[in-house]
Amino acid sequence: MKLQQNFTDNNSIKYTCILILIAFAFSVLCRLYWVAWASEFYEFFFNDQLMITTNDGYAFAEGARDMIAGFHQPNDLSYFGSSLSTLTYWLYSILPFSFESIILYMSAFFASLIVVPIILIAREYKLTTYGFIAALLGSIANSYYNRTMSGYYDTDMLVLVLPMLILLTFIRLTINKDIFTLLLSPVFIMIYLWWYPSSYSLNFAMIGLFGLYTLVFHRKEKIFYLTIALMIIALSMLAWQYKLALIVLLFAIFAFKEEKINFYMIWALIFISILILHLSGGLDPVLYQLKFYVFKASDVQNLKDAAFMYFNVNETIMEVNTIDPEVFMQRISSSVLVFILSFIGFILLCKDHKSMLLALPMLALGFMALRAGLRFTIYAVPVMALGFGYFLYAFFNFLEKKQIKLSLRNKNILLILIAFFSISPALMHIYYYKSSTVFTSYEASILNDLKNKAQREDYVVAWWDYGYPIRYYSDVKTLIDGGKHLGKDNFFSSFVLSKEQIPAANMARLSVEYTEKSFKENYPDVLKAMVKDYNKTSAKDFLESLNDKDFKFDTNKTRDVYIYMPYRMLRIMPVVAQFANTNPDNGEQEKSLFFSQANAIAQDKTTGSVMLDNGVEIINDFRALKVEGASIPLKAFVDIESITNGKFYYNEIDSKAQIYLLFLREYKSFVILDESLYNSSYIQMFLLNQYDQDLFEQITNDTRAKIYRLKR
């Protein structure tokens, strides 16, 4: 095909398809860089393929694996039948690639589809070339790349593509009044809700804004009102078969009998659609939010009356913490300058093309990251990318109005240079963003070996970070995972890992048996059920009773319980312990925990003191610590020569002190911790290899992870 010399004015279908293919290939190739880099490390491989880089991905991988097998265990929390698991199952059924290869590369290809709606939206405004530049930028912007790179096997791979397709149908409808687009809008909403159920609020906001836009700009056009009615039906909680049948039926009636449909019928249809939405429970999420904020005080009081109080998991998750404005701008547009130009361009785009206002819900959700956490930034990426593309158009248009003459050749060269420099920060980010796999091959092998020792109904007690991978590799059940980690859920695993071995063993058995019972009894609070069944007046009294080695269980043992203790958990030990350090009766912290892991960075040859990378100094021949100028005596210095053999040297220094200093020779790392954490089951059983053989049997003994079977 011979391209026009002034390609910025070309909006032909062939030209558009070529740009889409180029942008798609560019996006995929950028995501393959990580594969090339990671392939150099054998510890990232398992079963002859690179492993994935996201914990949540193992949930969908487990679901897909179970779908391929054709079954899963009752109450095993498998994502059997979930959207991504289903799509993976379909691909595995028709493609000649291994399961591991499919889940590794899916995000690279599906996430790159974002270029399609970006370029097509720009084409609706006769700005295809500028849309191409926007697609290049948006497809690899920092936050979007981070959550859709190769190996990032998660629903994020389509979480922007689908709402952008919805936005495309909105814009196309406002410009062309295309009746086929009338059908696409509700269909894309249905697909988006199936793919990502949490998209309900965004869908609701987009439909609401489209309704407001209709009343302001298209109040006399029937096709817009019918679109609203069909989208409301798509948003309802009816089974998808009924929704699709109803949508197609109404579409067909409008397509063939439009002249006989008046506004009274349209408004009646909208009323019926809202009624269907309400009766099917579609308004419940909205009503819940209103109830929570309007009647907040009484709701909180009722919550206190109904259950115990636990540590809030949101305080431990980086993605829900507020972020620095500069980081916010870089995550959306890869650089501060491009972000500013993109924002200006978006304002100009909305000024010149009112239909772009329909993108505000996505932009607002992305900007929520300033308060709600960095995970939301991706929603603003494609909208701001379109803003940048339009800024370039406005810039060249400004030059023409000022009669600044540029030849077509110079204009094209300048446009290419601007495009290159705008995406350069994103390319640099891709080069330096070298994410590791969730587990190493050694850790995956340890869990895979457990599959041959444990039964599918057995439980592995571990921290929630490892729940999904454990279920995937070991094919067992877990108490908590990436989707089940509220304070009341985390309490039990935290207790088992951070308390001494006797209460930990008792709680491990109780938490598993009561979790299984809760599937039938539907306990709102499992700990409260324990307290009630054992006739205790408070959670504190019940938890203290677990210190008895002869504790009598009222429940029968129904399965084996394993405890997974990886080395990688050591760095987050204070977070793990925080949940069980909270008194469920009043929500207060029982004690102030002290824990830090650090490496030596320098040694004073004169005094012999050792400076650690956390700012702490080891002084007086390893007998005290210097923290912010204050000297803190040590209770003991423990030199751990071998984690697997339990070979260590215990040097008591001050029996009245509370702080221990541990040196891990195998990792060349220091651990500073208080007495309660030193006596915890995790430190004793993993680092020191000291375990009560009446309570536990060691199944796996490795420097990377240990697994114990509960004998109780």
Swiss-Prot record:
GO terms for molecular function: glycosyltransferase activity; magnesium ion binding; oligosaccharyl transferase activity. Mn(2+) binds at D56, D154, E319. Changing Y468F: Reduces catalytic activity. A motif (WWDYG motif) lies at residues 463-467. Pathway: Protein modification; protein glycosylation. InterPro entries: Oligo_trans_STT3, STT3-PglB_core, STT3_N, STT3_PglB_C. Keywords: Cell inner membrane, Cell membrane, Glycoprotein, Glycosyltransferase, Magnesium, Manganese, Membrane, Metal-binding, Transferase, Transmembrane, Transmembrane helix. Its main location: membrane. The record marks D56, E319, R331, I572 as: Interacts with target acceptor peptide in protein substrate. Optimum pH is 6.8. The chain crosses the membrane at residues 13-37, 99-124, 128-146, 155-176, 179-194, 200-217, 223-235, 240-256, 263-280, 328-350, 356-372, 377-399, 408-432. A motif (MI motif) lies at residues 569-576. One of its GO terms (biological process) is protein N-linked glycosylation via asparagine. It comes from the Bacteria. Its cofactor is Mg(2+); Mn(2+). A motif (TIXE motif) lies at residues 316-319. The record marks R147 as: Important for catalytic activity. Changing E319A: Strongly reduced catalytic activity. Abolished catalytic activity. A motif (DXD motif 1) lies at residues 54-56. Glycans are attached at N535, N556. [alpha-D-GalNAc-(1->4)]2-[beta-D-Glc-(1->3)]-[alpha-D-GalNAc-(1->4)]2-alpha-D-GalNAc-(1->3)-alpha-D-diNAcBac-tri-trans,hepta-cis-undecaprenyl diphosphate binds at Y196, P197, S198, Y293, R375, Y468. Despite low primary sequence conservation between eukaryotic catalytic subunits and bacterial and archaeal single subunit OSTs (ssOST), structural comparison revealed several common motifs at spatially equivalent positions, like the DXD motif 1 on the external loop 1 and the DXD motif 2 on the external loop 2 involved in binding of the metal ion cofactor and the carboxamide group of the acceptor asparagine, the conserved Glu residue of the TIXE/SVSE motif on the external loop 5 involved in catalysis, as well as the WWDYG and the DK/MI motifs in the globular domain that define the binding pocket for the +2 Ser/Thr of the acceptor sequon. Oligosaccharyl transferase (OST) that catalyzes the initial transfer of a defined glycan (GalNAc(2)GlcGalNAc(3)Bac(NAc)(2) in eubacteria, where Bac(NAc)(2) is di-N-acetyl bacillosamine) from the lipid carrier undecaprenol-pyrophosphate to an asparagine residue within an Asp/Glu-Asn-X-Ser/Thr consensus motif in nascent polypeptide chains, the first step in protein N-glycosylation. Belongs to the STT3 family. This is Undecaprenyl-diphosphooligosaccharide--protein glycotransferase. It comes from Campylobacter lari (strain RM2100 / D67 / ATCC BAA-1060).
